[in-house]
């Protein structure tokens, strides 16, 4: 399992996010805090590879086709026939830093 140090935990405020490219994972990730819980997912839409962003109206969305994804589980919310979820990344907080893992 590959482990990467990403940022200090205090860099992310509640209802805020940031994105970063992780070369070792060949993926852009989005890290966000919602209801004081950290989430880490792929920031690349599984539909056609469009950019994913965070909307503090309780979903993630793709700019290209308007797909909305659940913050908690990454499932598509507005196209029930679209079954592919956003990829999750495991993470841990250690000595005030967020580390993510590739499964």
Residue ranges and their predicted role:
Residues 1-55, 70-71, 87-103:
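N-terminal pre-ligand scaffold of iron-sulfur
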Residues 59-66, 76-84:
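Short cysteine/histidine-rich metal-coordination sites, predominantly Zn2+-binding motifs
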């Amino acid at each position: 399992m590959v482990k990467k140090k990403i940022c200090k935990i205090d860099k992310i405020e509640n209802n805020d996010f940031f994105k970063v490219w992780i070369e070792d994972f060949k993926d852009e990730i989005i890290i966000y805090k919602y209801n004081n819980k950290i989430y880490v997912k792929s920031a690349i839409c599984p539909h056609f590879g469009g950019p994913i962003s965070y909307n503090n109206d309780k979903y993630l969305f793709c700019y290209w086709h308007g797909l909305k994804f659940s913050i908690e589980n990454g499932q598509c919310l507005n196209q029930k026939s679209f079954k592919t979820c956003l990829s999750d990344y495991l993470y841990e907080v250690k000595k005030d830093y967020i580390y993510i893992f590739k499964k």
